[in-house]
Amino acid sequence: MKLLFMYLLPLLYIAPILLAVAFLTLIERKILGYMQHRKGPNVVGPFGLLQPIADGVKLFIKEPIRPSTSSQLLFILAPTLALALAMIMWTPFPLPIPYSNLNLSILFILAISSLTVYTILGSGWASNSKYALIGALRAVAQTISYEVTLALIILCSVLLAGGFTLSAFAISQEFTWFILPLWPMFLMWFVSTLAETNRAPFDLTEGESELVSGFNVEYAGGPFALFFLAEYANILMMNTLSTIIFLGSCMSSLTLTTSLLMTKASILSLCFLWVRASYPRFRYDQLMHLVWKNFLPLTLALVILYVSMPISLLFTPPLPWKRA
């Protein structure tokens, strides 16, 4: 029985994430529909609730077409690896108990998220299509650029939390959320997560007018669905990480902790979708100008400020107080 549970545990961990990803796509289509004064999916099942299941079945029963000039092994390996990395990133998350409690969990998440670059680059190169390759190179440059600011913001929050574990963030935010002292960091973090997950207005990799569909232009059926699942799993993961780092969590009971974490992450995910419905796509030079000439100097200045403030106040006497 214990052996069976050991094999079933990863499945029990992955299944709810995939289910959440499926319904996130439905919520996105519904929100975009209502923002454009239309209904969105409303045919399959009650209120269109079974639309993601129908889409998944449709994609996986389609014939997997592979270009004859493509690198066959890498072409199939790239989407599989993308989804595998997206699932691995969830292991240190306290939901409320982590599947794998790591000492350096925040660095582990950052390292695995940077590995997703190789899946995008691999898919673009293996497709043997100029559109896919240009889209992949854009995605790689964009992801690497915005990871610099993400790492600096994480460094600053780690200095305040006093540890690299995600549970340390929950404990240190018991009285005050980090979003209050770090609100400029949070705004830059939110924009950087949009760019990191290749979402609008930073979806330069999928510029229809110039790149058809981006790095996954040659994919259809099952492999395309794997890329789709990986993208939305990364969106949910980034929003959950934003919640843990900046919006704290309740430590009173496990059920309340999970409910509040899910609610805050859902609200941030809705903000992602709202941004997509509201803003046009950036030009590529504007995208790079934003990170290298605006975000990077500002995050460096704020990191120096947050590091130097405690040191500068180290030898000052404590504030006088009177006994009541």
Curated annotation (Swiss-Prot):
It is a multi-pass membrane protein. It is found in: Mitochondrion inner membrane. The keyword Transport applies. GO terms for biological process: aerobic respiration. The chain crosses the membrane at residues 3-23, 73-93, 106-126, 151-171, 175-195, 226-246, 255-275, 295-315. The keyword Transmembrane applies. Its EC number is 7.1.1.2. InterPro entries: NADH_UbQ_OxRdtase_su1/FPO, NADH_UbQ_OxRdtase_su1_CS. Core subunit of the mitochondrial membrane respiratory chain NADH dehydrogenase (Complex I) that is believed to belong to the minimal assembly required for catalysis. Complex I functions in the transfer of electrons from NADH to the respiratory chain. The immediate electron acceptor for the enzyme is believed to be ubiquinone. This is NADH-ubiquinone oxidoreductase chain 1. The gene is MT-ND1.
